[in-house]
């Protein structure tokens, strides 16, 4: 009798440990939470060092996640497994309008962690602001989106690819982050006094201007760049006084 009880205890403990192990994040290059540490700054932050740290952090990407809403109105998405999910913070009427059309549907997520992972028993939660788009499907054509840049005095010019894939739309959150991160890595932005300027996105019914002297406003995080394969993106860099 005692042996049977002991075996049941051991079996239960083993199953519990296996269940706990299954909540660990997969060791993948772009989807592993352990690789991305949160570095949050206020949207009005203008300190160059803070902006550099924020736009140099690692991002997370997820495909075909399910977006859902709690009874209290908060927006969430299941990530790679049911025990790993995200709280999607949404601000502004246009971002909310886009999100509301995606409830209970498959979505793609470009995530920057607003805080460190919240771990509780058998559950882990990430916190992102925006970055959610309709999930790309096999019917969506593959394309490459390029960016051109120059300084205001036009002493130098250049360009680089900022996105390659088949997302039907892109969020300002994703494009802003990818563009700034690339410019920081190439020492074109927040270096040698080039601490301000604009990202201009036009074409295909788009008309956006992003201020490089501060973080992207939270209300813009889930606004869409429509027909991105036809969009024109230009960065103008300016020196601070």
Swiss-Prot record:
Keywords, A to Z, come to: Signal, Virulence
Q: Which SUPFAM superfamilies match?
A: Superantigen toxins, C-terminal domain
Give any Pfam family that matches.
Stap_Strp_tox_C
**What's an example GO cellular component term for this entry?**
extracellular region
Q: Which residues form the signal peptide?
A: 1-26
InterPro entries hit by this protein: Staph/Strept_toxin_CS, Staph_exotoxin, SuperAg_toxin_C, Superantigen_bac, Toxin_b-grasp_Staph/Strep
Q: What does the function comment of this entry state? A: Acts as a pathogen alarming molecule by acting on host neutrophil chemotactic factors FPR2. Plays a role of chemoattractant and induces degranulation and oxidative burst in neutrophils.
NCBIfam families, per database record: PRK13349.1
This protein's assembly is summarised as:
Interacts with host FPR2; this interaction promotes neutrophil chemotaxis.
What's the family? Belongs to the staphylococcal/streptococcal toxin family.
Q: Kindly provide the name given to this protein in its UniProt entry.
A: Superantigen-like protein 13
